[in-house]
Amino acid sequence: MDHIETAILNCYGIREAEQNMVFAARLTQHGHTIQNMADLMDLYHQSYSQKTIENIVGLPHPTVQKFMVITVAVVGASRRFLAQITRHQNEVKYMSASLQYSNYSGHAAFAIPYGIMKADKEIQDIYKKSCQSDLDHYAELCALGIDHDSAGYATPQGLRNVLIISATPYQWKHMIGQRTCRRNTDETRIVMLHIWQRLYKLSPILFAPDLTGPFCQRGSCMEKQMSCQNPISKLWIPSDILKADYPLLIRREVSSHKD
């Protein structure tokens, strides 16, 4: 699962999300003081502290976290990840590269699952050979005049993709909480941990572990008999989870930075 990159396309959106959240919460208590638009704008631009944000995000009123969307780009994750993450449909929108309109002949690449990355070279070669064979057949079909959409059925699930995800802060926290659980697939966990890491860096209060992480970080596991029985420390931030669960990726990242 190396060579997967994530980026927040509208970093300003997090600041606006915080401001809108505070404004919406204050509005419920100051309706009697607002006589005109000028009064409303004064309330909107009223300053606030990080403690104010902390108090509001801890309340059981998620609507105030839904007045802004944060857009994230994911480059290099597989189309299998696409199939999994798009199960989330509330307050979230997606735009993906298209097999119908794109010609991947000579340009396609495939993701390597973390389990295969850890395996012996012989196993890695079997996987790579299988994926490359599929991509070669795809290119051959396109060269024979088959349309890209039809030829796309020959591509492997591991085909790398480009995906844009736009969601409210509340929905990001919901998706991250569900998809960073240790019962999820490695690729989905890795992508969502990287996204969480970027969001946490910009707003460690809004995306704190006890508000964003899997059930075991927020309180206790809700999977009951399906629990992995290996809870994540409530103190860990996303980078700590990546280091503990995916050390091979961290070593490769460090090595690439040195190079």
Residue ranges: model-predicted function:
Residues M1-D259:
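Family-specific signature for flavin-dependent thymidylate synthase
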